[in-house]
Amino acid sequence: MASPSQASLLLQKQLKDLCKNPVDGFSAGLLDETNLFEWSVTIIGPPDTLYEGGFFNAIMSFPSDYPNSPPTVRFTSEVWHPNVYADGKVCISILHPPGDDPNGYELASERWSPVHTVESIVLSIISMLSSPNDESPANVEAAKEWRERRDDFKKKVSRCVRRSQEML
């Protein structure tokens, strides 16, 4: 098990790497300069998607045994999406700990692995925005709209994008 100091060192390194070599599509930094385990992330809505032009804020919370266990990611901006719970928590395979999948939706290779970094997590979230998974939704209503009433879904996402721009 990773000690908090190992987790701190790894998070410090990942933060330094992201500051030195920023990645298109998002920015990340500490929520509070004294706590390496809480990050503030802004994801820019990916081009050629319904989320294009949006600026979506999230908090990434790391456990003390990171990277052995995954962080949680919760949008603080409103995001209407099949894979985002009503409280903003992101539901994607790589954030699920290894082990049994009671619903049988995921391969073990799709779940959390200590090789993932802040960058790979956020890039997976950007990919999720581009390609919703409506097979195992966190937000059943959004998934139903995505499948059955795409125009209504698009209107709600447009409203989220507009609100995210107004918050700048």
Which residues does each predicted region cover?
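Hydrophobic residues positioned within well-ordered beta-strands of beta-sheet architectures
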Residues: 39, 56-58, 71, 123
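Amphipathic repeat-derived elements
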Residues: 50-68, 153, 160-161, 165
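N-terminal onset of structured domains
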Residues: 2, 19-56, 64-66
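Residue-level recognition of well-ordered beta-strand positions that form the cores
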Residues: 42, 59-61, 74, 93
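Non-catalytic surface loops within mature trypsin-like serine protease
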Residues: 45, 62-64, 77, 96
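Domain-scale recognition of soluble eukaryotic interaction modules
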Residues: 2-22, 70-168
